[in-house]
């Protein structure tokens, strides 16, 4: 009796990019205990009267609160992607992303605990979270979360790090800029695979999703809690210019995926 021939191995070379980001994520893994908690001040230390110092702490606490809020939502989104992805290479990657977002949340919780606890929530960030979680297709979830949001948020980490030299906050922002760069790169790699044979109607839904997301992201980027209202007014023109540059870059990324971006409506 002759042995049954083994089935030909499926060609998985299209997923090589996703696997590369899985390996990179494993290489870059860090632990919350690695953060220099006892060696550096949590945030820049203010000078002047106790009242002035307390106001300065409130400003930094509001910055940390926004990042904590974003990463709590990101935990849900990453878990949803892990559950939704059918491909083993993507599931391997998303298993690391779930760990990353949980680690980020733990670190932000520790940091904000040293600044007096949680503060005012950003309503636009909550709206973005609902938009991501309620997206209908895997293509849309990856597009909104990793292709757009993760990429658009990286410059903010770099900006916060530059403004908080020699602190735990700077250390965390530098770590998260690297992690989110990997999340974004993996999302680009996986979205290319997902869109390679996707029908035009799926691609059209991504443009519709971008048009829903971009105004909300702009509102989120420009929103300031009460603790930062005055600073926000002083820096609004610069913030708008920076945001415009970032959104244009996001549109170029969408175009690089083979999407027709002519119908994307920028909020500026």
Question: At which residue positions do the language-model features occur?
Answer:
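Short amphipathic alpha-helical segments with heptad-repeat character
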Residues: 65-68, 72, 95-98, 102, ...
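Amphipathic alpha-helical segments within well-ordered protein domains
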Residues: 78-82, 95, 158-161, 174, ...
């Amino acid at each position: 009796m002759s042995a049954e021939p083994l089935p030909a191995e499926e060609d998985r070379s299209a997923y090589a990019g996703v696997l590369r980001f899985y390996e990179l994520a494993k290489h870059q893994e860090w632990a919350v205990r690695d953060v220099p908690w006892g060696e550096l001040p949590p945030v820049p230390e203010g000078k002047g009267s106790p009242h002035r110092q307390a106001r300065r702490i409130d400003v930094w606490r509001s910055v940390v609160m926004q990042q904590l809020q974003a990463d709590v939502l990101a935990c849900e989104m990453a878990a949803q992607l892990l559950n939704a992805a059918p491909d083993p290479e993507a599931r391997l990657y998303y298993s690391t992303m779930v760990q990353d977002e949980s680690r980020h949340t733990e670190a932000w919780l520790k940091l904000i605990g040293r600044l007096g606890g949680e503060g005012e929530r950003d309503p636009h960030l909550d709206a973005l979270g609902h938009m991501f979680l309620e997206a209908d297709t895997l293509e849309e979830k990856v597009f909104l979360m990793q292709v757009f949001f993760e990429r658009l948020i990286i410059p903010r980490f770099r900006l916060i790090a530059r403004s908080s030299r020699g602190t735990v906050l700077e250390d965390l922002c530098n770590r998260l800029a690297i992690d989110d760069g990997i999340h974004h790169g993996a999302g680009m790699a996986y979205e290319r695979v997902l869109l390679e044979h996707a029908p035009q109607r799926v691609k059209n839904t991504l443009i519709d999703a971008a048009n829903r997301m971009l105004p909300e992201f702009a509102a989120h980027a420009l929103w300031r809690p009460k603790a930062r209202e005055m600073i926000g007014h002083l820096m609004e023109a610069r913030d708008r210019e920076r945001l415009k540059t970032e959104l244009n870059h996001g549109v170029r990324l969408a175009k690089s995926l083979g999407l027709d971006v002519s119908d994307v409506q920028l909020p500026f």
